[in-house]
Curated annotation (Swiss-Prot):
Residues 156-177 are annotated as: Disordered. GO terms for cellular component: cytosolic large ribosomal subunit. It comes from Gluconacetobacter diazotrophicus (strain ATCC 49037 / DSM 5601 / CCUG 37298 / CIP 103539 / LMG 7603 / PAl5). The gene is rplF. This is Large ribosomal subunit protein uL6. Belongs to the universal ribosomal protein uL6 family. The keyword Ribonucleoprotein applies. Gene3D superfamilies: Ribosomal protein L6, alpha-beta domain. Keywords: Ribonucleoprotein, Ribosomal protein, RNA-binding, rRNA-binding. This protein binds to the 23S rRNA, and is important in its secondary structure. It is located near the subunit interface in the base of the L7/L12 stalk, and near the tRNA binding site of the peptidyltransferase center. The lineage of its organism: Bacteria, Pseudomonadati, Pseudomonadota, Alphaproteobacteria, Acetobacterales.
Length: 177
């Protein structure tokens, strides 16, 4: 069983953390994030460290212990450094560009795909075949990247589609004559 929860979270300089009415708040140079704490969890701030511990030994308390610690750690990292995911667009004529507050993609359909960029997320296209999603909230950055990828998932025969830059596509051999 994992014991992630027992390790305290280091708070870097430039990040302010507080607990107000059962809500953990992290403020940094990139923004502010809030996390409502479960009733099964106690959090304590001391010496630039955040400690999380369960209330009692019930199963829900032990389950939320490590989860809450991981969420707090990602919040602290998000407001200080931020998170980013890079997507690659592969295919003949496939490209992406940011126009105003929309991401416009040509992915081989008869129409362009227009994706409205959500608040709190920054999307850039350093090249027509690369999309960079950045933000302070790890979950939202991952969800936006997944939404963009789902418009044209990579197919296994030619590898065309939108994929994460770290993702490897398992290729299949075409049919033989």
């Amino acid at each position: 069983m994992s014991r992630v929860g027992k390790y305290p979270v280091e708070v870097p300089s430039g990040v302010q953390v507080s607990i107000v009415d059962g809500i953990f708040v992290a403020k940094g140079k990139l923004g502010e994030l809030k996390l409502p704490l479960s009733q099964h969890i106690e959090a304590e701030i001391a010496d630039n460290k955040v400690s999380v511990r369960p209330v009692g030994t019930a199963a829900p308390a032990r389950m939320m212990w490590g989860t809450t610690r991981a969420l707090v750690a990602s919040m602290v990292k998000g407001v200080s450094e931020g998170f980013s995911k890079t997507l690659e667009v592969t295919g003949t004529g496939y490209r992406a560009a940011v126009q105003g507050s929309n991401l416009v993609m040509n992915l081989g359909y008869s129409h362009d795909i227009v994706y409205a960029i959500p608040a709190g997320i920054k999307i850039t296209t350093p090249r027509p075949t690369a999309i960079v999603v950045e933000g302070v909230d790890k979950q939202r950055v991952g969800q936006v990247a997944l939404d963009i990828r789902s418009f044209r998932k990579p197919e296994p025969y030619k590898g065309k589609g939108v994929r994460y830059d770290t993702e490897t596509i398992r290729r299949k051999e075409g049919k033989k004559k």
